[in-house]
A protein has these predicted regions:
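Bacterial N-terminal signal peptides that target proteins for export
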Residues: 1-7
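C-terminal motif of bacterial Sec signal peptides marking the signal peptidase cleavage site
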Residues: 15-18
Length: 322
């Protein structure tokens, strides 16, 4: 089973206003600088949690920051490393997985404090128990549910042999569905963006209605005012690429790149990170589409066309066999 890790940078603004990075970080166009500051913030927050383990705002801030940092500043750059840096790429992905799991651990502890029994439902993956716990949640819990689900699935995507996480997928779906029920407009369509990748990445029958992918894409764009690159990249990667829809892939990535980050200054960092991803995908488009050439596509029938063969760089007379 293959699970695609989600473009979680689209949800970064959820906690930025309350954490030490604040507006300065969100309005930055320098991800490298911001990425270097986050480990220090996390270290300070961990120390604060030791003294104030029941501080709900601090729990949410720290747990979500771990998940965001792992995705946007560790795994994201690792995914774009060249193949010859395999060892470094794997090391960075291992580091990202550890950060995902630490974030989930912190958030789970926070939700267990609010709703005793949550930890048991999460750890067992029991769908009915999870539904019972979710009935007690309120709108303010949508952030917890979003980040726990996203962090868990991203960690699983980096090690699909983690059967303990794999058995939680149905329970995680219950959690994200509840988050959407509680706050469908959460963070400018972040859950709609999530659903695009969630439904597209998992096998038919394991998760909900895949026919809703296009509708969630439409809603993600609508709720973000068309100012976030994330939904276009999500659709390109999770729908166009698997369907070998070259034109759809290219079109959506170009739409992502056409967004002016200065039109939504509060999400400038988000769009800067996502647009780097879009450029990388376009620059490496030949890796994702069968039959893609530098100048043109070669249709299936053309491979056996006599005229095409005559124009090829070899002919039968030049081939010798010992």
């Amino acid at each position: 089973m293959k699970v695609t890790c989600f473009a979680l940078a689209a949800g970064i603004s959820l906690f930025a206003a309350s954490c030490s990075l604040t507006t300065m970080a969100m309005r930055s166009s320098n991800p490298e600088f911001i990425g270097k500051q986050i480990p220090g913030v996390l270290e300070k927050n961990e120390r604060k949690l030791e003294k104030s383990p029941d501080d709900e705002a601090l729990i949410l801030e720290t747990g979500s920051l771990y998940v965001m940092y792992a995705n946007a500043f560790v795994q994201g750059p690792a995914d774009m490393l060249p193949s010859y840096e395999f060892d470094r790429k794997e090391a960075e992905k291992s580091r990202a997985r550890a950060d995902y799991l630490r974030g989930v651990e912190i958030l789970n502890a926070g939700l267990e404090k609010k709703y005793p029994g949550f930890a048991e439902a999460y750890n067992s993956g029991d769908v009915e128990n999870m539904r019972a716990v979710m009935e007690r949640t309120v709108k303010e819990d949508a952030a917890y549910l979003y980040w726990i689900t996203a962090g868990s699935l991203c960690a699983y995507s980096l090690n699909p042999m983690d059967f303990a996480l794999g058995m939680k997928i149905k329970a995680l779906e219950v959690m994200i569905d509840r988050a959407y029920e509680l706050d469908p407009d959460f963070n400018s369509g972040a859950i709609d963006d999530f659903y695009i990748l969630f439904y597209a990445s998992l096998p038919e029958g394991l998760v909900g209605d895949k026919s809703m992918i296009d509708e969630h894409f439409r809603l993600a764009v609508e709720k973000s005012g068309g100012l976030l690159a994330g939904p276009y990249i999500s659709y390109a990667q999770s729908v166009a690429k698997p369907n070998q829809d070259y034109e759809g892939f290219k079109m959506n990535l170009e739409k992502a790149l056409a967004i002016d980050p200065d039109k939504d200054r509060d999400n400038r960092l988000v769009n800067t990170i996502n647009q780097r991803k879009a450029r990388y995908l376009l620059d490496n488009i030949e890796d994702y589409f069968i039959g893609y050439g530098d100048d043109e596509w070669i249709d299936d029938d053309e491979w056996l066309d006599d005229e095409w063969l005559d124009d090829a760089w070899f002919d039968d007379e030049e081939i010798e066999f010992d």
